[in-house]
């Protein structure tokens, strides 16, 4: 069975470490990249084309919403990843914005 490729982005190193450990313990997942900001994640997505991207909404350089919007408009990708967004802010407008930009979860 093909493992799902996953990329993760968060500006909090502790969150990145937790996510990396969770992914590495699951035999069906394979970590293909991690980033501390949205600009790095955008480049990882273009290069690696992961199946799943877990990303924070509030990050430096590009926020998670901007990353999703740019990827949605990217013509050279063979496929768009499934986005799972993380945020410490529980505002409904942020959640709605994430789903409108392409978030799956």
Question: Would you name each region that the model predicts?
Answer:
Residues 13-33:
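Two-component/phosphorelay signaling modules centered on CheY-like receiver
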Residues 66, 90-105:
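Alpha4 helix (beta4-alpha4-beta5 surface) of REC/receiver domains from two-component response regulators
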Residues 48-54:
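Active-site beta3 strand of CheY-like receiver
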Residues 37-40, 63-69:
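Acidic catalytic/metal-coordinating carboxylates
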Residues 59:
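Receiver (REC) domain active-site loop signature in two-component systems and cognate sites
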